Amino acid sequence: MTYSLKDLAAQLQTGSQGARALVEDCLAAIDDPNGEGQRSFIEVYHDRARNEADAVDHARKQGWSLPAFAGIPMSIKDLFDEAGIVTRAGSKILQNAAPASSDATVLARLKAAGFIVIGRTNMTEFAFSGLGTNAHYGDARCPFERDPNDITKGRVAGGSSSGSAVSISDGMAPATIGSDTGGSTRAPAAFCGIVGLKPT
């Protein structure tokens, strides 16, 4: 994605871009067998994202009032609760835990603003490392010095929000949310050559 969120929102509002087309672009990047999608995402919502995008496109054609960012896909770190989804925190230990009963506040607000969640991103297990490696779900690699013929070669993406950062750097989502206590958003952003923000 080479557009800002503001630009994408304007394109959607004017009809020069459709939500379904945006979602399909993201899914194609995620599903690319030569890309980092399989190591950057723990779960991808193919059908749900498409259905939500179609609903946004339909509503826009009807002239209905929509939130500012309606139809823009985003990824979320596997540390945030989402109603009906298991929050694994990048660990196999929690894969059979009970699904979350509600959305995390930040996620609820992003959905209310119109974002479409396209999937949950890989992360350092329990957010406990700055490298971004994960023995269970693979190591998402930063965009620099990758070897497309050998997934064991390449630089780490930084952690703990590794998959979130790579989802942006590789065009798998135009927006993401990570978390940051001691650099878990800022470090992967720096490693991947993008911008990460930790609000104070």
Where are these regions (language model features)?
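Enzymes and membrane/adaptor proteins characterized by extended Gly/Ser/Thr/Asp/Glu-rich
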Residues: A68-V106
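An N-terminal boundary/leader segment
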Residues: M1-N51
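Conserved hydrophobic/aromatic pocket- or pore-lining residues that grip, position, or stack substrates
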Residues: A49, G71, K77, L110, ...
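Immediate post-signal peptide segment of exported/extracytoplasmic ligand-binding proteins
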Residues: V56-P73
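Short glycine/serine-rich loop segments
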Residues: S102-T200
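Short acidic-aromatic low-complexity motifs
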Residues: G15-S16, G63, K77
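Long amphipathic alpha-helix in the N-terminal Rossmann-like dinucleotide-binding domain
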Residues: D47-D54, G114-F115, T124
